[in-house]
């Protein structure tokens, strides 16, 4: 299994000058360092690809032993195009991908890795306008996933997996996305084409996407509790 970490964006909402994945947590490690440590434990460093863009040198100098793909249109494209750049380097393997600003417990990864189908990590928390939301078909698989889903069952937290048999179709739909589309648009297109995507409920695990200073404060409080 390969891993793609999406770390190309500017992250202006957090109000910092460095790439958001390098944001330091309360324990002194960066968001990206925490991700890489956990991913290496389960899947190995050689299987990790990081998509970089904004101030790419800072990330590459911090983690010189990783494989990198540069999205030179990082300032005019969104996660659909960054993910496609990474997947174009991968042939015939399952792929786990995640946003580079998600802080999570290590054990959460096993839930995704061990799922036998393409899947996404979700919770059943209340959601606001900015969160990526989801709902389900009657069979329990993902139906819709976007910021505009209403009513929504919870949040899609930005950690996902595509299995080998779905990879070609998913890549094709990423190619159909507009530059400013999130990768979830390609998931919706693939679901419309018949791809089955399972929700993996991670509500019992620590998992938070860091978009704003308040998120950083909240995750710092959670980490104080030893998670």
Positions of PLM-derived features:
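Conserved core of the sugar-phosphate nucleotidyltransferase
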Residues: 105-177
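Short glycine-enriched, charge-decorated loop/helix-capping segments at active-site entrances
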Residues: 18-24, 73
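Short beta-strand/turn micro-motifs composed of small residues
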Residues: 7, 26, 52, 99, ...
């Amino acid at each position: 299994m390969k891993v793609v970490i999406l770390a190309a964006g500017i992250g202006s909402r957090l109000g910092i000058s460095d790439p958001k994945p390098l944001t330091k947590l309360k324990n002194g490690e960066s968001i990206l360092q925490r991700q890489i440590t956990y991913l290496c434990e389960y899947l190995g460093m050689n299987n990790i690809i990081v998509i970089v863009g904004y101030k790419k040198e800072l990330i590459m100098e911090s983690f010189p032993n990783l494989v990198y793909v540069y999205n030179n249109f990082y300032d005019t494209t969104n996660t659909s195009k960054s993910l496609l750049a990474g997947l174009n380097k991968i042939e015939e393997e399952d792929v786990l991908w995640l946003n580079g600003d998600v802080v999570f417990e290590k054990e959460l990864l096993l839930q995704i890795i061990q799922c036998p189908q393409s899947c996404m990590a979700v919770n059943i928390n209340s959601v606001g306008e900015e969160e990526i939301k989801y709902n389900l078909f009657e069979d329990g698989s993902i139906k819709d996933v976007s910021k505009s889903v209403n009513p929504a069952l919870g949040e899609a937290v930005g950690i996902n997996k595509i299995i080998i048999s779905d990879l070609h179709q998913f890549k094709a739909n990423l190619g159909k996305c507009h530059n400013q589309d999130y990768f979830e648009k390609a998931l919706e297109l693939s679901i419309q084409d018949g791809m089955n995507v399972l929700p993996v409920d991670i509500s019992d695990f620590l998992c938070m996407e860091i978009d704003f200073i308040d998120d950083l404060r909240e995750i710092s409080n959670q980490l104080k509790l030893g998670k």
